[in-house]
Amino acid sequence: MGIDLIAGGKSKKTKRTAPKSDDVYLKLTVKLYRFLVRRTNSKFNGVILKRLFMSKVNKAPLSLSRLVEFMTGKEDKIAVLVGTITDDLRVHEIPAMKVTALRFTERARARIEKAGGECLTFDQLALRAPLGQNTVLLRGPKNSREAVKHFGPAPGVPHSHSKPYVRAKGRKFEKARGKRKSRGFKV
């Protein structure tokens, strides 16, 4: 017995209709944005709602240095990130800016507020910009995760820059490949 597929033998791609997380605050934010999507004709709210459903991997964090870079010349607008804002010690001067995010690390929040900026939550944003007016929607770098470094063509294949999964970093483990007989081959 097979299964009856309606779309002529293709199973449709699935997409999330609710967050997987049991976080009650996230669920309340979703409830609020569901209402806004239904009652307003704003694309911004739809994007926010879709991103609230995403998995943690797809809600990449954004560092203060990138935030400052992206917001240069847009200091009067509100930066919006569905994810975490993290501190970056490499940046010394922070302009006063308004930032909305799901969470802020302790130091990032302290530094933004010390510079005369504001750290907003999504329910505060909904009151200030119900249609997303004067906002800059940002995303963190998804491919900066450690795990992503291992993806791609197999390590050892020509022109591959994938990181091998190595048990240890010692002399005997994937060191001197091509220079020593015992380590793969010798040229």
Curated annotation (Swiss-Prot):
Stretches the record annotates as Disordered: 151-187
Q: Give the main localization category.
A: cytoplasm
Q: Which GO terms describe its cellular component?
A: chloroplast; cytosol; cytosolic large ribosomal subunit; large ribosomal subunit; plant-type vacuole; vacuole
The compartments listed are:
Cytoplasm
Where are stretches of biased composition, namely Basic residues?
160-170, 177-187
Summed up, the tissue specificity of this protein is: Ubiquitous.
The record's listing under Pfam families reads: Ribosomal_L18
Q: Name one GO molecular function term.
A: mRNA binding
GO annotation, biological process = translation
Highest taxon, organism lineage? Eukaryota
Q: Which UniProt keywords apply?
A: Cytoplasm, Ribonucleoprotein, Ribosomal protein
Q: How does it assemble?
A: Interacts with NIK1. Interacts directly with EXA1.
What protein family is recorded?
A: Belongs to the eukaryotic ribosomal protein eL18 family.
The entry's protein name is Large ribosomal subunit protein eL18y
**Gene source species:** Arabidopsis thaliana
The coding gene here is: RPL18B
